[in-house]
A protein has these predicted regions:
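N-terminal low-complexity, acidic/polar interaction/targeting segments
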Residues: 1-194
């Protein structure tokens, strides 16, 4: 399947949500096509220290997103809210006539639901706390799934300021067990702000 690709510093995983500002004509075309086809588009993780002009590679795993809301902003900008649908593996990328990236991709597995336990409930509690502290983030989720560690871990992976290659390592796993261990260790570190 061929799907438009948007490299972005906002990292999004299945069931995650983000608000994006779309400015370039090629990306506005991407949004129009995503809305008319119901195929969505891909959001590929790039680290915040990389400029779009220097992107020569994107991670193999990327999230397909659907647009759940949009509105016009000042200055001919477009504001959209997207939600992650699934994970796809990029096989090949080509550049379209207007420099929009188009990816040939194949389905990849997504983590199954994974129930919270007394041992890992700490992660859900800290995420609730983060959502209360950062209302713009918390308001994106009208029905948060704090009892599902897959959902909780994916939200943490999206927001934590860790290198994209480590995020990719975590999402390459067949379930969230490694992510739970990693996040428990990271979030229980007293030097971490959260």
């Amino acid at each position: 399947m061929k799907i438009p690709l948007l490299p972005h510093t906002d990292h999004l995983l299945p069931k995650g949500r983000a608000k994006l500002t779309i400015a370039q004509a090629r990306h506005i075309r991407m949004v129009k096509e995503a809305l008319s086809s119901n195929e969505g588009f891909l959001m590929a993780m790039i680290d915040s220290n990389r400029e779009e002009s220097e992107i020569t590679e994107v991670p193999a795993l990327t999230t397909r997103v659907q647009i759940i809301d949009f509105h016009r902003l000042e200055g001919d900008l477009l504001g959209i809210t997207v939600e992650g649908i699934d994970i796809l593996r990029i096989m090949k990328i080509h550049v379209d006539f207007d420099h929009l990236l188009i990816a040939d991709c194949a389905p990849y597995f997504i983590w199954p639901p994974f129930p919270a336990t007394s041992e890992n409930q700490y992660l859900a509690d800290k995420l609730k706390q983060l959502h209360a502290t950062v209302p713009d983030l918390g308001e994106l989720y009208t029905e948060p799934k704090y009892s599902d560690m897959t959902w909780v871990c994916q939200r943490w992976i999206e927001v934590l300021p860790i290198d994209g290659k480590y995020k990719q390592l975590l999402i390459h796993q067949e379930n969230p067990k490694l992510a739970i261990r990693f996040l428990m260790k990271l979030l229980q570190d007293k030097n971490l702000i959260y």
